[in-house]
């Protein structure tokens, strides 16, 4: 039961759903506090703030979280090489725990009794938001207006008109889009048919290959302890580096992903993603790890990477397992220092060179020239011992087969 002056924090985007949610929550008796979190969507946050107030929110907060998103969320995805099902760079999944954290912080500040989000009952985000919120504030109430009101799109528009809520002029767009610094996610409309190719208007951050430059761009990316810190020698904070690289790579058509995805809620969904900067950084970072990791670590880390991707996708950011995996990641990154040179061309990221003060590549051991320092005679004993279990097994099996033939002949 909602009491008079009970506050609720609404994750507010400025779109139709959360705009209608302000009125709907007010009808339930709440004082609505709108909260927009900027993780790099490129929206006019001041306009969104004013819109919330005009629609009846008692207060409206806009939080710039781009740098925090880059340094504490996207960076983990980069260092963990997280690709859900080997394809999806966790664009939306990465922002949800940060948004949830900001909502909970504001709820405590405003002494709110509840938090509301604008997710439907069909997607993954409802799970991510609610699990994250209750991990940080176990006893707070959660409202999900869009999931609860059971309206068709037409009924929602009728409600908006009755309550003088502006209907966006792009409402006829068939797509559902979410984006942040790390990439852009697109679904619905013609994309729901997995046989149909994604049309040109489904993309925004990448050029079609036919429209990309006919000459490649070469970049040098500098890493310190696994963190990208410079492009072509220009030092940049991580958020700015991602933004700049996103524009450069997008011009070359890099980072388009068309993926049939197994959602957490049990259905398959066709998703179209654009992640130009993420695609380049993931490639460059992996190449630098290949240069600096010893073999056992290089072979083990992908096991953690897959579990990390699943954990983030499934909304378990604030969990003991996640904390342990992040600690593992941070430990591994101490040697990931150096520069990677990549060529961007016609949708491809090609590594041309890499160097590191922590490189484990020894030219004198690897070369086949007269400078070779590898003791090839040591291979004789190594092969004998390495192959001994296989050799012994073969001898035992051969003996057993011979005895079986003898027994059969005497039977």
From Swiss-Prot:
EC primary class: ligase
Any one Gene Ontology BP term: L-arginine biosynthetic process
Positions bound to ATP: 11-19, 118
Family, similarity comment: Belongs to the argininosuccinate synthase family. Type 1 subfamily.
PANTHER family xrefs: ARGININOSUCCINATE SYNTHASE
Family annotation (HAMAP family): Arg_succ_synth_type1
CC terms in the record's Gene Ontology section: cytoplasm
Signal peptide (UniProt feature, chain positions): none
Subunit structure: Homotetramer.
EC number(s) per entry: 6.3.4.5
Pathway: Amino-acid biosynthesis; L-arginine biosynthesis; L-arginine from L-ornithine and carbamoyl phosphate: step 2/3
Residues that coordinate or bind L-citrulline: 88, 124, 128, 176, 261, 273
Domain of life: Bacteria
Keywords, alphabetical: Amino-acid biosynthesis, Arginine biosynthesis, ATP-binding, Cytoplasm, Ligase, Nucleotide-binding
GO MF annotation: an example: argininosuccinate synthase activity
Protein name: Argininosuccinate synthase
Catalytic activity reported: L-citrulline + L-aspartate + ATP = 2-(N(omega)-L-arginino)succinate + AMP + diphosphate + H(+)
Subcellular location(s) per record: Cytoplasm
One Pfam family it belongs to: Arginosuc_synth
Residue positions binding L-aspartate: 120, 124-125
Organism name: Lactiplantibacillus plantarum (strain ATCC BAA-793 / NCIMB 8826 / WCFS1)
């Amino acid at each position: 039961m909602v009491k008079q002056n009970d506050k609720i924090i609404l994750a507010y985007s400025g779109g139709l759903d959360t705009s209608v949610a302000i009125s709907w929550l007010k009808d339930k008796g709440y004082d609505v506090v709108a909260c927009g979190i900027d993780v790099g969507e490129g929206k006019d946050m001041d306009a969104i703030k004013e819109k919330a107030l005009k629609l009846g929110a008692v207060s409206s907060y806009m939080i710039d979280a781009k740098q925090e998103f880059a340094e504490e969320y996207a960076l983990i995805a980069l260092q963990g090489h997280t690709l859900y099902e080997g394809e999806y760079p966790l664009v939306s999944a990465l922002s949800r725990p940060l948004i949830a954290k900001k909502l909970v912080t504001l709820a405590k500040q405003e002494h709110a009794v509840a938090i509301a989000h604008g997710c439907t009952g069909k997607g993954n985000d409802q799970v991510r938001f609610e699990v994250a919120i209750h991990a940080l504030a176990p006893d707070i109430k959660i409202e999900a207006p869009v999931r609860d009101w059971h309206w068709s799109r037409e009924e929602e528009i009728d409600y908006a008109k009755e309550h003088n809520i502006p209907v966006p002029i792009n409402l006829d767009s068939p797509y559902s889009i979410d984006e942040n610094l790390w990439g852009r996610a697109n679904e619905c409309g013609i994309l729901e048919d997995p046989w149909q190719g994604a049309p040109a208007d489904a993309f925004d951050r990448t050029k079609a290959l036919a429209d990309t430059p006919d000459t490649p761009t070469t970049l040098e990316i500098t890493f310190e302890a696994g963190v990208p810190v410079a492009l072509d020698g220009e030092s940049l904070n991580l958020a700015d580096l991602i933004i700049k690289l996103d524009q450069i790579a997008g011009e070359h058509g890099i980072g388009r992903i068309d993926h049939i995805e197994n959602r957490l809620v049990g259905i398959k969904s066709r998703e179209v993603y654009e992640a130009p900067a993420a695609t380049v950084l993931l490639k460059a970072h992996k190449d630098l790890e290949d240069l600096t990791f010893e073999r056992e670590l290089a072979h083990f880390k992908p096991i953690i990477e897959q579990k990390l991707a699943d954990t983030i996708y499934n909304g378990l950011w604030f969990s003991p397992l996640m904390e342990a995996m992040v600690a593992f990641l941070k430990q591994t990154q101490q040697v990931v220092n150096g520069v990677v040179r990549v060529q961007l061309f016609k949708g491809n990221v090609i590594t041309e060179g890499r160097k590191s003060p922590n490189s484990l590549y020894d030219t004198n051991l690897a070369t086949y020239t007269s400078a070779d320092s590898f003791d090839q005679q040591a291979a004789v004993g190594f092969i004998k011992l390495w192959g001994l279990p296989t050799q012994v097994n073969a001898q035992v099996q051969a003996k057993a087969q011979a005895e079986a033939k003898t027994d059969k002949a005497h039977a």
